[in-house]
Amino acid sequence: MPKLSHYGKRGQVQMVDVSAKQVTTRTAKAHGFVRMKPRVVSSVRRLKNPKGNPLEVARIAGIAAAKRTAEWIPLCHPLPLTHIDVTARLCENGVELHSTVIATAQTGVEMEALVAVTAAALTVYDMCKALDKGMEIIGIHLVEKTGGKSGDFHREKPSQRLAPRGRKR
């Protein structure tokens, strides 16, 4: 059974020593969703938001946050990221968020991909909260990761439907 790598022999937390690990190309993808009322979706679609375009600002926030993941997550290694892509797509009941992060490093970029989607979701919420404080940030999860000793991971199916149809608010 795998063990938690952030615990030392005496149970103290520690940053994992990756100095002996191979430098390989690592990739990770994450998804998330901000559920909102139809009137908020309509406002975003028409770009009628007092703070500007939330989708573009969310993309930039996600990219900036991914680069600072080691400051968000105390035991993460600062990594030389070579590519970050964050997309924000408006759909009928909210905003779908996707991130892809790539690095050539000694440890993976899963946390960077998750932080990118999380920051993007929080930014959408911040920019639209004047219209609806009841928005929900849901379904943030790792979709896939490649590279490294633990091998590849591909999520078989989402744990929940991110954008359920017909839900009344």
Regions found by a protein language model. Name each.
Residues 1-55, 60-77, 81-169:
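C-terminal binding/interaction regions
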